[in-house]
Amino acid sequence: MTQVLFYGCLFITFSPILAFFFMVIAKNSQLVILTIGGSFFWLVSILIAAIWWYIIPPMREHWWFIISFSVLFQEIFRYIFFRLYSYGFNDRPSLNQIKETQHQMALDSMRKRKQAQQQKQQPPTNEIESINNEIIDTTNNNTNNNNNNNNNINDDDNKEITEEEKEKRKIEKQKQREIEINARLETLSARPNHTLSSAAIGVGSGVAYGFIMFGSILWESTGPGTLFSPACPSVNLFMLSSIITLFMTLLHVVYNVLAFQGYRSKKYHLVAFVIITHFVTTYLTLLNLPTKTTSCVGSILPIGIITVFSVGFCIFSLLKSDSITKIH
């Protein structure tokens, strides 16, 4: 029975977010890197909150005090990650842009070289007048020499044309090779849109939250016997924690998408919504403590309602701003 409980809680908690990861994020290497970065920044924020909890003794006895700082550090690092993301994806050129710039520079240099060769072939105006005077003064005996000179000039033009064709063919081959390389490395060079990028970062934060906050509790379910929630003696503690962790992991994805959209488009009411609901849902978990006035229903039901509302609000805001299809 303990193994069934373990795998049941495991699949309930991580199935939705891992399904989204393998079906959407794992197909693009940049999204995978962003997911790892989201996990790292969330772990750093929790590490700083733990240090803060350790160096201030009064915080060890009051959960509401440490929760406020924990949420605050998470939001600060979310904004720091957004600044890094905006610098790396907006202010820096992509691989395709770099290749296109190099190709354009090669074409410009070839065009300048061609213009310089044409200027060398054209004599000055004074020389043209003197040549015309000499042609008028010359006799018919010089016609053969002029024909020979014209033939030599035509030969030189043919040589120059062949050299230009060789350069064009060389550049075309190089461009074709670059197109083939970009086609093979499409997942590397393709830049995902902002919505997928922010969702990938949120998935990283949610997975890290699930494994850190619920992993140790879930492992205890493999032991003999079972535990019940102090706030609801008839409810299994592992199942209750699994459902709450499921809601929180989904909220991490939604919070990151809304916060990044708010920072990017300067819609700060989205950022305010994220911060307020993050505080509310985190404080609602305190209702699971063993006190006379708490109840697990008062915790899990509001968190579930907030999760459903937040997901709907996130989809509505994305469709309204057309952020799902925008790349830049």
From Swiss-Prot:
Pfam name, any one: Aph-1
GO biological-process terms attached to the record: autophagy; macropinocytosis; Notch signaling pathway; phagocytosis; protein processing; sorocarp spore cell differentiation
Transit peptide listed as a keyword: no
GO molecular function ontology, one term from the record: protein-macromolecule adaptor activity
Topology with respect to the bilayer: Multi-pass membrane protein
Record: glycosylation sites: 141, 193
Biased composition annotated in UniProt, kind: Basic and acidic residues: 159-175
InterPro entries with a match to the protein in the record: Aph-1
Localization: Membrane
Keyword field: Glycoprotein, Membrane, Notch signaling pathway, Transmembrane, Transmembrane helix
Binding partners and assembly: Component of the gamma-secretase complex, a complex composed of a presenilin homodimer, nicastrin, aph1 and pen2.
Family: Belongs to the APH-1 family.
Listed name of the protein: Gamma-secretase subunit Aph-1
Source organism of the structure: Dictyostelium discoideum
Gene name per UniProt: aph1
